[in-house]
Amino acid sequence: MRVLGVEGTAWCASAALYDADAAADSVVIESDAYQPDSGGIHPREAAEHMREAIPAVIETVLGAADGDIDAVAFSRGPGLGPCLRIVGSAARALAQALDVPLVGVNHMVAHLEIGRHQSGFQQPVCLNASGANAHVLAYRNGRYRVLGETMDTGVGNAIDKFTRHVGWQHPGGPKVETHARDGEYTALPYVVKGMDFSFSGIMSAAKDAVDDGVPVADVCRGLEETMFAMLTEVAERALALTGRDELVLGGGVGQNDRLRGMLEAMCAARGASFHAPEPRFLRDNAGMIAVLGAKMAAAGATIPVADSAINSQFRPDEVSVTWRDPESPARDPGADAVRQGAEATVTFADDAVIKERAPKAYRHDRLDDRLRRDRTVLEARLTSDARRQGVPTPLVRDVDVPAATITLQHVGDADLRDALSPARVRAVGRHLATIHDGGFVHGDPTTRNVRVGAERTFLIDFGLGYYTDAVEDYAMDCHVFEQSLVGTAADADALVAAFEDAYEEAAASGRVLDQLRAVEGRGRYQDDPETA
């Protein structure tokens, strides 16, 4: 099968030809990237570039074809509406002229699938790090589920906003990478909430640091060390939550050597496999559109021209995945004497649990020391405070702050992830409402951080928690728990409803669930889509 792919979601006009029947992967890519005269991407100028460049790159690729085209695939979204409309129109016209099926591809799923295709991985977690996006995906029940994502700006856009502030031309990522090699680490805000992250505060702090006279190279080093450590930590949390041992990287920011090195080091430390496609498949390109288009066409996932409207807000979890096998069971570490979590090694001894936050080789030493120390102290305090509020938690038996080690009572028989029930989920709703009324959050209440026994449901691992009276923070706690249900449970909708019912009954304020709706709408591409 030969598939012609067309890509043009934002700034890169690209066409590609993929021959699925070739002895070795054969992908011919022709791209023409838009380069603004100054500042960032202007939607109107980008669309004008697409209008001129798309016909040219398609013509070049068609000239390289040595046989008939069997299908046309195009990036249906997400992206800039004016650019997507040009790409969609070109793809429809081409499919009709060639009298072949049309395939509408989700741009972000294509970033994931090109890594899965090239690596041969079966059940990977995917970290997508691109201009407008940053999210972690895993396959579950016929869809790629969003386990975590940016709650404001994309990682690449945050970098570009910083570089525009210092007067550098788009794209900013390569310039930050170059300057960071000569810089010293500068501390910047580190914001991870469960498996979600925020980059707007880091970007603002980086601008302020430059304005205050900190050398630009030092700020660039701080940006890389902070932002990429956040991405790597969340990817590791996703591996731990799902029990998977394969990670693929997608998106243009993935071309950064430091980010790839961090992810590779993290995976090596936990015995997981890692794959990053070659750079031409990481940045926006039609090759990944053609490869996924071939898989979708072979599975019959084509669309009539009349139903092929673009969707500028096309989320990856909206795509029905029909082209791959069902998921295989994840490895169950429950019986292991030593368990490797996302940020700590847990050793079981009699009725005790010894939790050690060992140094993370992928993080800068100063950042790593700060996170390990602060999280150890907070976990001990908040675990005890929650217990005083009446929430079942382990007894804290010993804390060694310099060694970042806590000894706790061993509680429960299983993680909630492996023993889900409406009653236990309702208990989590009551527990979170109680600690929120007490003035603090858990910070990472996933189904791996809840232990269950015959009669009680325990909250554990408060290392990302903190004291706060902000309704927004309480809503984020609820959001993190619900995301973990969606990523691991077959009947997630019913369990989410049970959780929210119990939370609403127990909480002193009714504002948290209202704010939760606002938080859910803040993820990438949640607004009404632009279609045409």
From Swiss-Prot:
Record: residues binding L-threonylcarbamoyladenylate: 128-132, 160, 173, 177, 256
Annotated positions binding Fe cation: 107, 111, 284
InterPro entries, per the entry: Aminoglycoside_PTrfase (IPR002575), ATPase_NBD (IPR043129), Bud32 (IPR022495), Gcp-like_dom (IPR000905), KAE1/TsaD (IPR017861), Kae1_archaea_euk (IPR034680), Kinase-like_dom_sf (IPR011009), Peptidase_M22_CS (IPR017860)
Residue numbers annotated as active site: 444
Kae1: annotated span: 1-323
EC number of the protein: 2.3.1.234, 2.7.11.1
Record GO biological process: tRNA threonylcarbamoyladenosine modification
Binding site for ATP: 338-346, 355
Organism domain of life: Archaea
Residue stretches making up the Protein kinase domain: 329-532
GO cellular component, one term: EKC/KEOPS complex
UniProt KW Glycosyltransferase keyword: no
Subunit composition and interactions: Component of the KEOPS complex that consists of Kae1, Bud32, Cgi121 and Pcc1; the whole complex dimerizes.
Sequence similarity: In the N-terminal section; belongs to the KAE1 / TsaD family.
Task performed by this protein: Required for the formation of a threonylcarbamoyl group on adenosine at position 37 (t(6)A37) in tRNAs that read codons beginning with adenine. Is a component of the KEOPS complex that is probably involved in the transfer of the threonylcarbamoyl moiety of threonylcarbamoyl-AMP (TC-AMP) to the N6 group of A37. The Kae1 domain likely plays a direct catalytic role in this reaction. The Bud32 domain probably displays kinase activity that regulates Kae1 function.
Designated name of the protein: Probable bifunctional tRNA threonylcarbamoyladenosine biosynthesis protein
